[in-house]
């Protein structure tokens, strides 16, 4: 339904989706080969597994030697647009520390449609980045490990696992031929 709305109105405000499912169920492929191609938007992948420092998302102040902008701005630069499909993998694997909570706070800001038109990267301290048209998609396995405020902002979809017979068909028809 949401994808249909974006197809009809490409300038629609961004959406935040979360896909829950066991590893190997095709969550990444669905988004990369399905959603981003249907919408004709660039796909960007960001691994959150083991993330321990929010600066990888929002950069470092340019006054520090060797500093650079964060991954969010890097995605915008590489995609050359303001409305990519940004896929955050393993949301439930963010470190369970105060630094991990900082990461969850930034992700909460990104998914807040009332304020994500003014995202700040520390490297570009005086510039606002309008992320209101970006589509944010998250994947996770264990819902209990997701920040409750962030979880509340996400439209949740469940991807089930496969039976052994289904896995054999997928392997024979799609994986082995590649």
Label each PLM-derived region with a short phrase.
Residues 89-91, 112, 133-143:
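A short beta-strand-to-loop transition that corresponds to the Sensor-1 phosphate-sensing loop
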Residues 1-20, 176-177:
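Pre-Walker A (pre-P-loop) alpha-helix and adjacent loop at the N terminus of AAA/AAA+ ATPase modules
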Residues 79-83, 119-139:
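AAA+/SF3 P-loop NTPase mechanochemical coupling elements
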Residues 90-129:
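Conserved catalytic/switch belt of AAA+ P-loop NTPases
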Residues 12-47, 77, 108:
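Walker A/P-loop
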Residues 99-100, 123, 128, 141-154:
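Short regulatory helix/loop adjacent to the ATP-binding pocket of P-loop NTPases
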Residues 54-58, 135, 145-177:
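Conserved AAA+ ATPase core "coupling" helix
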Residues 38-67, 75, 95, 166:
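AAA+/P-loop NTPase substrate/partner-engagement loops
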């Amino acid at each position: 339904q949401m994808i249909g709305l974006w197809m009809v109105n490409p300038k629609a405000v961004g959406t935040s989706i979360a896909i829950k499912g066991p590893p190997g169920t095709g969550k990444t492929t669905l988004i990369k080969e399905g959603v981003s191609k249907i919408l004709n938007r660039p796909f960007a992948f960001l691994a959150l597994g083991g993330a321990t420092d929010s600066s990888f998302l929002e950069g470092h102040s340019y006054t520090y030697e060797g500093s650079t902008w964060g991954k969010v701005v890097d995605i915008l630069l590489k995609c050359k647009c303001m409305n990519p499909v940004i896929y955050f993998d393993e949301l439930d694997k963010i470190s369970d520390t105060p630094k991990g909570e900082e990461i969850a706070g930034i992700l909460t800001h990104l998914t807040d449609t009332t304020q994500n038109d003014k995202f700040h990267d520390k490297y570009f301290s005086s510039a606002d980045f309008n992320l209101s048209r970006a589509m944010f998609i998250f994947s996770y396995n264990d819902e209990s490990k997701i920040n409750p405020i962030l979880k509340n902002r996400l439209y949740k979809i469940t991807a089930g696992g496969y039976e052994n017979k289904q896995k054999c068909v997928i392997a024979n028809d799609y994986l082995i031929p590649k």
